[in-house]
Amino acid sequence: MFFQDIIKNLNNFWSEEGCLIMQPYDTEKGAGTMNPHTFLRAIGPEPWSVAYTEPCRRPADGRFGDNPNRAQHYFQYQVIIKPSPEGIQEKYLTSLDSLGINPRNHDIRFVEDNWESPTLGAWGVGWEVWLDGMEVTQFTYFQQCGGIDCKPIPIEITYGLERIAMFLQDKESIWDLNWNRDLKYSDIWLQFEKSQCSYNFKESSADNLRKLFEIYQSEAISLIEKKLTYPALDFVLKCSHNFNLLDARGVISVTDRAQYIEKIRKLAREVASSWIDERESLHFPLMKNSKEIFL
């Protein structure tokens, strides 16, 4: 199955399950969880069901395209359903079947692995999903986002698209994956990967990155004070990405690292709190078809 068809099949499957099918968010981020369709919508009482593909950037993970299964840019497929429905594990297994992976013919294991994002003030309990010995999915019941308790509890399912594609196409390297009939993954992304790695590890200016962090932090604080939640989150995400760039450059001490994380976490919590206040002022509009309010 081509890489693009994996995304198409997952879109079709989760659409049939009632999920809103959305597009990636247009700001650099380290994981699909940072998309406001997850980070903001996971908190508060309103029901929410969404699925989307998310390109993710983790600058320190780059290897100039020389590593067969590690890159600074990759794709996740993200599903969030709130409240978490009954039988969600079975639905997940059925989604694998829609990709041509029959659960009865493979060793699929749910391995306990609780998840945490210090910069987002977010954590949850759940599992890694292993397919014939390879991790392909993270399965998490969110407990907090932005330091706010999740009530009701949402389920997050995060598929590792490259790993699933490697399994389906029997490839040893992501760069050999067939994106479609004519192009390989490397035809599209290898030059991008090499140039971004050169920037991440060699060409980025640590001084400029530090200045940008301060600018982004200042903008986020100003926007939070003005109750502009979405643009405030944009600048929190920029702070997070800038921190990751500084980390990749190797210019952050242990002490500085803790301080940067705390600054971002504080901003994320304030954005989350602002979001709840904003939705409450609107009388939680998505509750109109729901019978329960969780506060």
Swiss-Prot record:
Its main location: cytoplasm. It comes from the Bacteria. It is found in: Cytoplasm. The keyword Aminoacyl-tRNA synthetase applies. Disulfide bonds: none annotated. Keywords: Aminoacyl-tRNA synthetase, ATP-binding, Cytoplasm, Ligase, Nucleotide-binding, Protein biosynthesis. It is an enzyme of class 6 (ligase). The keyword Endoplasmic reticulum does not apply. InterPro entries: aa-tRNA-synth_II/BPL/LPL, Gly-tRNA-synth_heterodimer, Gly-tRNA_ligase_asu. One of its GO terms (biological process) is glycyl-tRNA aminoacylation. Tetramer of two alpha and two beta subunits. This is Glycine--tRNA ligase alpha subunit.
